[in-house]
Amino acid sequence: MKQFESSLLHDKLKEYFGFSSFKGNQEAVIRNVLEGKDTFVLMPTGGGKSLCYQLPAMLMEGVAIVISPLIALMKNQVDAMRTFSADSGIAHFLNSSLNKTAVAQVRADVLSGKTKLLYFAPESLTKEDNVAFLHKIKVSFYAIDLSLIHISEPTRPEPIS
């Protein structure tokens, strides 16, 4: 994996996102992603989790696949990325809210190399056409953003006596 000096990471943070410094352990997490290491990130809401995969996606060859559970969250993330770039193709999502024409445009942007972040709902990854599409492209890494999923203990029905 390509090595990035701290000053270059800070320069790219400013260039792409307008921030002059990282929060908490973002820089260490980003370095791990850039080095191809499996990385688990647990941060509070507003802690900057998304940047931990967005900045590496901008710096690496290929497209980062982000698995996110909510269509609204995907749209917000894509809209936010598009505010940082003059190219609206920089980030896209593929989910059930898109018609065939929109899906074709997303795929064309990804295949052309414009797209650096592609968001999927988990269930979209079970569709054969999406799996086939992923085999055609260079994926830089996968990120699973489960920030809004609530995991609780399973409940069992009371036994009937």
How would you label these PLM feature ranges?
Residues 149-161:
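Single conserved hydrophobic/aromatic residue that forms the stacking wall/gate
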Residues 2-42:
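Conserved pre-motif I regulatory segment
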Residues 65, 71-120:
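Conserved nucleic-acid-binding Ia/Ib motif block in the N-terminal RecA-like helicase ATPase lobe
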Residues 41, 65-66, 118-120, 142-144:
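Hydrophobic positions in the central parallel beta-sheet of the AAA+
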Residues 35-41, 62-63, 115-116:
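Pre-Walker A (Motif I) flank of P-loop NTPase domains
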